[in-house]
Amino acid sequence: MLRAASYESLSGSLAKSETSTRSNTRGKGGQSRRKESRGKMRAVSSSSGAFPTEQVLEVWRTSDAVAFDVDSTVCIDEGIDELGMYVGTGEKVARITKEAMEGGLPFGEALQRRLEAMAISRELLESYVKEHPPKFSPGIKELVAKLHAQGKDVHLISGGFRQMIAPVATELGIPSENVHANTIVFNEDGSLKGFDDKEFTSRAGGKADAVKFIKSTKGYKHVVMIGDGATDLEARVSGGADIVIGYGGAQRREKVVAESDWFVTEFDTLVNAL
């Protein structure tokens, strides 16, 4: 795991990269460059004071693609929980979500239990999507725009529902084929039938499978996963995500803080590090 470095470690690394420039510099010019170096270090730190290692920064800057979780990452809320509130079963659905995100419940089981609790119909789902536009996390639009400007592909990998994530992808300029999420299946009369169990994220370890799929089919050398939950950490496997960046701007989960390669609470931190 390429874990976060100390301030002193990264300070030394950045200092080495500028040694040749500073070695012949004196006076105010040298002071200016030292201030610039300190500014670079502050730019890539999270609000918790942790710095990424050189290796993590290198992967972040040279990655071919970045995959984002959606709920409590790209968007500030948990979409399934909000849908549960809409149909009147919000508290029960939220409890199941919390248990799953903290790693205490297999995701496939959690998905089935939440759908059963909501008993959502096609009509209700369509109404919800129309009445609830995406609530984006601060800085995510700027980050995605910069990733696109640098020629990096952006994917959304979510345990949420494709029908609810489609507007998110559209607004961020992410093509539909780069959305990997669950699909609610309805009967002909519009009543709930279940979910498509062929989707990657309908099962445990699905995010890892999704990343391995896009990495192999797209020929990516490096893929970064960004998310707030335990299922995002699972993407860091052989052939999967090279690093996982934990995001705590909406929900802070201690497992993610402890086990991610880099933990941030603001997307501006990632923008500044590109």
Locations of regions flagged by a protein language model:
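Short, acidic/turn-prone active-site loops that include or flank metal/cofactor-
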Residues: A181-F186, G248-R253, D268-L270
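Short, charged, surface-exposed secondary-structure boundary motifs
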Residues: N187-K193, E254-D261, A273-L274
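Glycine/Thr-rich beta-alpha phosphate-binding loop at enzyme active sites
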Residues: S176-A210
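Conserved Lys-Pro-Asp/Glu-containing loop-to-beta segment of HAD-superfamily phosphomonoesterases
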Residues: S202-L233
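N-terminal chloroplast transit peptides
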Residues: M1-G27
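Alpha-helical substrate-recognition element adjacent to the catalytic core
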Residues: S37, S48-E188
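Acidic, Mg2+-coordinating phosphoryl-transfer loop and its flanking beta/alpha structural elements
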Residues: S158-G159, K221-W262
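N-terminal mitochondrial targeting presequences
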Residues: M41-S46
